[in-house]
């Protein structure tokens, strides 16, 4: 991390189909080796699946899923007097979004459906309902923070 000045955040352009910045960020996060068209096909395919199977607005399902998966607190290691403590800290808004997207991606990858679009559609639908692998990860992080609440006075 640079110590001189704060590095400016890059502006992410909204995606062409839905005009949503979060969808564009998720596509960029899903993209491998610069293959954006493949990432677009996966995300839009997942959105079509949500539309046909659930009959709900895919953009709404996506935003609800993201908001459900966002963590509020996490633990950070802090060394105090020769012992490492897991100190619960609040998560910055930008990191919340990044973690939620990362967890959704990883949970979708672990699913057993045939195509990535189907996996992502299933994971987004489940996360919007408060279930699924990404929600399990968020609950695990929250549980760790709750268990280590006694060390919250070791602030950073």
UniProtKB/Swiss-Prot annotation:
Q: Which GO terms describe its cellular component?
A: small ribosomal subunit
Which UniProt keyword terms apply here? Ribonucleoprotein, Ribosomal protein, RNA-binding, rRNA-binding, tRNA-binding
Database matches in PROSITE patterns: RIBOSOMAL_S7
Please list the GO terms describing molecular function: rRNA binding; structural constituent of ribosome; tRNA binding
Q: Name one GO biological process term.
A: translation
Question: Record's Gene3D superfamilies?
Answer: Ribosomal protein S7 domain (1.10.455.10)
The record's listing under InterPro entries reads: Ribosomal_uS7 (IPR000235), Ribosomal_uS7_bac/org-type (IPR005717), Ribosomal_uS7_CS (IPR020606), Ribosomal_uS7_dom (IPR023798), Ribosomal_uS7_dom_sf (IPR036823)
Please give the family membership noted in the entry. Belongs to the universal ribosomal protein uS7 family.
Query: What PANTHER family does the record point to?
Result: RIBOSOMAL PROTEIN S7 (PTHR11205)
Describe, as the record does, how this protein assembles with itself and its partners: Part of the 30S ribosomal subunit. Contacts proteins S9 and S11.
Q: What is this protein called?
A: Small ribosomal subunit protein uS7
Q: Which organism is it from?
A: Burkholderia multivorans (strain ATCC 17616 / 249)
Source species taxonomy = Bacteria, Pseudomonadati, Pseudomonadota, Betaproteobacteria, Burkholderiales
Q: Which gene encodes it?
A: rpsG
